[in-house]
Amino acid sequence: MYKETAKQVLDFIQKSPSCFHAVAEMAAMLKNAGYEELRECESWELKRGGKYFTTRNGSSLIAFAIGNDLDDYHFQVTSSHSDSPTFKVKEVAELKGKGGYVQLNTEGYGGMLCATWMDRPLSIAGRVLVKEGNTFVSKLLSFDKDLVLIPNVAIHMNRDVNNGMKYNNQVDLLPLFSAGECAENDYYE
């Protein structure tokens, strides 16, 4: 039983690289479990024994079930959150460096331990707004492969790095997206 539960949790985590993916995955799980989706902008007709959920902004979800015995008034409430420390890509996403490299213009979100993001392959996932006709629609995206890296500087460029580094998110934590184009003689054969 525990192995199956652990497998389900790991599967959920794998399918949920962002809070938007987590909400979409939870909504699908609730629908499969017989929950009815409600829209916030409509009046709700709730019934005894009904199971319901609603989402807001694609980033939050509330689910509830109504008991059959409504004479016994009580609530059991459990809550959690699906967002976590992350970097959000800004609207003007590309920052080009002097050497032709490209960094992503990001903003840190949440209480993060900055050093843990350094020197490890990272991917990109989340929500984008796409124009379809005369309207914009929300789409989930996940590249599911390593695309960016937030590099530490070499020790000879910052001898005090091991004495406590104070990171500037807008300078030190911008993900490197591309090393730029190589000229014909920029590599060894």
Task: Map each language-model feature to its residues.
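N-terminal hydrophobic/helix-forming segments and targeting peptides
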Residues: 1-189
